[in-house]
Amino acid sequence: MAKEKFNRTNPHVNIGTIGHVYHGKTTLSAAISAVLSLKGLAEMKDYDNIDNAPQEKERGITIATSHIEYETETRHYAHVDCPGHADYVKNMITGAAQMDGAILVVSAADGPMPQTREHILLSRQVGVPHIVVFLNKQDMVDDQELLELVEMEVRELLSAYEFPGDDTPIVAGSALRALEEAKAGNVGEWGEKVLKLMAEVDSYIPTPERDTEKTFLMPVEDVFSIAGRGTVVTGRIERGVVKVGDEVEIVGIRATQKTTVTGVEMFRKELEKGEAGDNVGVLLRGTKKEEVERGMVLCKPGSITPHKKFEEEIYVLSKEEGGRHTPFFTNYRPQFYVRTTDVTGSITLPEGVEMVMPGDNVKITVELISPVALELGTKFAIREGGRTVGAGVVSNIIE
C-alpha cells in the first residue's frame, strides 16, 4: 500500500497547472500523480477523476477545481487543476486556491495561444510568483528546430509579462505517453521527463514563508467593552503572531491609531500568544470601544497602510451565476467587501472600454469613500444589495 508512506515532514507547497485549453493540463496532472504513485509518493488519479472537478464556492462564486496531492523526495504538494478557462480566471482572481507557483503547459505542436498569454498575465496580476514550463506533446513534433522555436516564443512571452523568461526552466515531454507508461506499471523514457519536470519544480519554486512567519494582521470582526479591563477586539488572525506587550496599529476607516496588547484570549482562556488561523480576543490598552469598528485591522506597526484609490483585476459574475443581468459603466458604485466589511466605491473603466458585461474579466480603477487597509494581492468581493456580483484582487495602489 502506497498510502502508508504519506508523512507530513516535508515542507508544503501549493501549485497548479495553467495554460491554453486542450494543451494537456489535466493529462499532465494525471501523469504526475501516476508517475509518482509508482514511487510510492502519490495515489494515482485518473484523468476522468480530475476532469470531473467538484464545484466549490469562494466569495459567492462557484468554481470547478480539482485538488490532488502528491509528494516528491523533498516536498509535499497540493496541486490544483481547473477544467474550464473561466474557472481558471475565477480561481486566480478569488484566490480560491492560492498558488506558490504554477506549471504552464504549452503544446509543442501548437505553441503559445491566447489563453497561454492570458494565464501568464493573470499570474502576473494576482501574484503567482514563479512559473515552470512543460512543453507537452513532444511526441507529435518531429522537427527539433520547431521545438526550439516554441521554447523561444514561450520565453519571450514570459519576459513580456515581467517573468524571468531566460531563466525559466522548460521541460519537454508527453503527458499522455508518460501516463500510458505509468498505467502499464513502469517509468520509462516519457515518465523520466515528468520526473525531470518535478525536479525543476522542487528546485525552482521556493518553499513559501509560513503564515505564522509573516507580519501580524487581524481583521476586526467585533468590539466589546469589558468593565475594569478595557476594550477587546475579536477576529481571526490572518497572518503572523501576536503576544501580550506587542505594539499594534489599528488601521482603516479612520486615522491610524497605535496601542499596546494587554491580553490575548481564546474561548475565555488567557493565551501567551495568538497565531495565524486562531480566533482570538485581543485586549487593547487605553483604546475606547467607539474608536474601533468592524472593517479595521490590527497589525504590526507600519506593515500595512490605509488606501482609497487602487487598480484591481476583477471577474464579473455571469447572469447564470447569479450576477447582474446588464452591463455596467464607469461611475458604477457597488460595495467592496474587504475582509470583514462593505465599503462603497466608484469604478472607472480602462480607456477604450465602454462597458463591462456579466462574465467578463477586466482591470478597473476603484475609489472608495473611506480608506481601508490594503496591499497588493488583497482580495475582495464586489456586492450590490447584499449579493455578490464580482470578485477582485488589488493589482496596483494609486493613493
UniProtKB/Swiss-Prot annotation:
Where is region (G5) located?
174-176
Ranges where the tr-type G domain occurs: 10-209
Q: Where is this region: G1?
A: 19-26
Instruction: Please name the InterPro entries in this protein's record.
Output: EF-Tu_GTP-bd, EF-Tu_GTPase, EFTu-like_2, EFTU_2, G_TR_CS, P-loop_NTPase, Small_GTP-bd, T_Tr_GTP-bd_dom
Q: What's in the GO CC field?
A: cytosol
Quote the Pfam families the UniProt record gives: GTP_EFTU, GTP_EFTU_D2, GTP_EFTU_D3
Compartment annotation: Cytoplasm
What main location does UniProt list?
Answer: cytoplasm
Q: What is its EC number?
A: 3.6.5.3
Residues of the region (G4) are: 136-139
Where does the signal sequence lie? none
* Broad enzyme group: hydrolase
Name the residues that bind Mg(2+). Answer: 26
Alphabetically sorted, this entry's keywords are: Cytoplasm, Elongation factor, GTP-binding, Hydrolase, Magnesium, Metal-binding, Nucleotide-binding, Protein biosynthesis
Q: Is the Nucleotide-binding keyword given for this protein?
A: yes
Q: Name one GO molecular function term.
A: translation elongation factor activity
Q: Where is this region: G2?
A: 60-64
- Entry binding sites for GTP: 19-26, 81-85, 136-139
Catalyzes what? GTP + H2O = GDP + phosphate + H(+)
Q: Which portions of the sequence form the region G3?
A: 81-84
Role = GTP hydrolase that promotes the GTP-dependent binding of aminoacyl-tRNA to the A-site of ribosomes during protein biosynthesis.
Subunit organization:
Monomer.
Q: Which family does it belong to?
A: Belongs to the TRAFAC class translation factor GTPase superfamily. Classic translation factor GTPase family. EF-Tu/EF-1A subfamily.
PANTHER family tied to this protein: ELONGATION FACTOR TU, MITOCHONDRIAL, ELONGATION FACTOR TU-RELATED
Q: What is this protein called?
A: Elongation factor Tu
Q: Which organism is it from?
A: Helicobacter pylori (strain J99 / ATCC 700824) (Campylobacter pylori J99)
Gene (name only):
tuf
